């Protein structure tokens, strides 16, 4: 018989918003478990851009996705959350008012008072470039994300795409690459203007080879790339030497089982009350990129704000008879004791 795990709050998603929600809930003596489909904490920060700089976290001029994840994990240590990784929530059943029985694809069963959906954009899959045989090189020399920059040191790197990700990694990897080629289908880039300007400066200085066209063929053996053929826009072809390829064609987002949980949806996002970030189902909240409301900004700092307000409503479900007094960590000896700093 499967053992039922009982917790005050179950958080679906262990990205930055889910992690910070643990902190805000912990200050209110609310215990949390987290479930994430990934095999690591950090969400998109850990999976897609662990070494990419983030510049808009308040008070931190620059931090990488990995660095932010590590800092959040350190911050929530006092509250000892339990993580259930490589699992996906498949079913949510209402058993109380509020109260939910939640089942994962691994057969794990939770009973929680409050359910928090912090699943980002749902599950995300990189769009595969339309190049015959590309799948034979995936995971060895074709990569859809940069997890360790050092893995690309001294390599002949081919980057394909014209958006922010393609430009950012062109700029970040260029100093450690043996050679670098950027291929885009047109000489018009969708990335930030300052990134486009920096990229063109690299081209002018001979540090980057820019090809305007499309990849038509890959060469290599046993999963290892040795080169690629580009059909240029003037109908000529160009041969590129490369042993690592990074295609950035965007992501396909899939909401997954969340769509079957009885929640109102709007363009695959969950509408919420902006005072509490509660959904149409009492006791189920949505924070981070998964939710929508007028003026919504898909920023990590917005998700932190949403998690703080969510916790203030969630605690009333967990402790309906308890009078909750708002406290500041700067002055409350009670909160400081919980954090282990007093």
From Swiss-Prot:
Enzyme class per UniProt: oxidoreductase
Binding site for FAD: 17, 36, 44, 49, 89, 124, 289, 330
GO molecular function: ferredoxin-NADP+ reductase activity; flavin adenine dinucleotide binding; NADP binding
Cystines in this chain: none
Enzyme Commission no: 1.18.1.2
InterPro entries: FAD/NAD-bd_sf, FAD/NAD-binding_dom, Fd--NADP_Rdtase_type_2, Ferredoxin-NADP_redctase_2
Alphabetical keyword list: FAD, Flavoprotein, NADP, Oxidoreductase
Cofactor(s) this protein cannot do without: FAD
Catalytic activity of the protein: 2 reduced [2Fe-2S]-[ferredoxin] + NADP(+) + H(+) = 2 oxidized [2Fe-2S]-[ferredoxin] + NADPH
Cofactor: how bound: Binds 1 FAD per subunit.
Subunit comment: Homodimer.
Family of the protein in this entry: Belongs to the ferredoxin--NADP reductase type 2 family.
Protein name: Ferredoxin--NADP reductase
